[in-house]
């Protein structure tokens, strides 16, 4: 399937499985009359494969070592990207950032690394399923930077176009999205 065909098919899946209208309170605390819940798309076999494919194509030339983001939204996405990258013979490892470290065990903020493995000096991309203001992704960026990593990109599947671009620019972070909310609202 061509990139444009993959993108169109994924948009159809998102529209069917993950987009809705009706009043909702967003993670940012804002109210909205539409929403995206990408988990049904990320956990659908075809949706997961297309998200991984389009994301991998975006990252392929970035010389990325790791991909990850804030739990819960980034976990299935990071895993799918890591798996596809292995199949493409260009491995990109995955991690996730806890919203709050567990109060038992290793008490880690960044999970998924083997004993002795570190993000220090590694090129990382922060992925997110849906971005509104950028606040959640910036929390993940801060935790990953504390681990010594270089953030080369913040990549979201859907940008709600409600301030994230400006927030990332102010933080000096490159930002891209696979889709904009307006692509779904205007159809």
From Swiss-Prot:
It catalyses: orotidine 5'-phosphate + diphosphate = orotate + 5-phospho-alpha-D-ribose 1-diphosphate. Keywords: Glycosyltransferase, Magnesium, Pyrimidine biosynthesis, Transferase. Catalyzes the transfer of a ribosyl phosphate group from 5-phosphoribose 1-diphosphate to orotate, leading to the formation of orotidine monophosphate (OMP). Its cofactor is Mg(2+). One of its GO terms (biological process) is pyrimidine nucleobase biosynthetic process. Belongs to the purine/pyrimidine phosphoribosyltransferase family. PyrE subfamily. This is Orotate phosphoribosyltransferase. It comes from the Bacteria. It comes from Rhodopseudomonas palustris (strain ATCC BAA-98 / CGA009). Pathway: Pyrimidine metabolism; UMP biosynthesis via de novo pathway; UMP from orotate: step 1/2. It holds the Pfam family Pribosyltran. Its EC number is 2.4.2.10. It is an enzyme of class 2 (transferase).
